[in-house]
């Protein structure tokens, strides 16, 4: 069960926060006719996660925000992209047992969990000059778990 307060908090942190940051950053980017906006969703934003409805909804909303902003801000030289990580070894995984992690790795086609560095490397590339023709995309960093 999710309370209305939990629902709203999840949306505020994962969707409204991103919207507010975009609102603050965009005027300067539009003036300069250049910029990169990167959002971080989740594979659950792409597929939905059982017992994760509020998280999945917030992350799916972030994907929608990314795509709409890409269309809106492209003419101003601003690209907007999203990274949707899968099972990544972070503090969010701290409560998982070694057996749970092994089972998740076994479900993943590449046979292991991802690292934060793998997500970060993609974000660095998308923030760079060589990514100027990439916009409105959702990049799964999930070892093939979501294909």
Q: Model-flagged regions — what are they?
A:
Residues 42:
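Residue(s) in the substrate-gating loop at a strand-loop-helix junction
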Residues 3-8, 93, 100, 104:
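Substrate-binding pocket helix/loop in short-chain dehydrogenase/reductase
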Residues 22, 58, 66:
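Active-site helix of classical SDR
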Residues 47-53, 75-76, 111, 129:
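Active-site loop immediately N-terminal to the catalytic Tyr-X3-Lys motif
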């Amino acid at each position: 069960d999710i309370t209305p307060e939990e629902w709203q908090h999840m949306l505020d942190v994962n969707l409204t926060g991103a919207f507010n940051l975009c609102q603050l950053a965009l005027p300067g980017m539009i003036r300069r006719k250049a910029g990169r906006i990167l959002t971080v969703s989740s594979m659950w934003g792409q597929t939905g996660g059982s017992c994760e409805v509020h998280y999945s909804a917030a992350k799916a909303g972030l994907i929608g925000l990314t795509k709409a902003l890409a269309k809106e801000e492209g003419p101003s030289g601003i690209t907007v992209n999203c990274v949707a990580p899968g099972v990544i070894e972070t503090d969010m995984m701290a409560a998982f047992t070694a057996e749970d992690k092994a089972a998740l790795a076994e479900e993943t086609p590449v046979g292991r969990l991802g690292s934060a560095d793998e997500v970060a490397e993609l974000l660095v590339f998308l923030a760079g000059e060589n990514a100027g023709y990439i916009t409105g995309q959702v990049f799964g960093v999930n070892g093939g778990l979501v294909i």
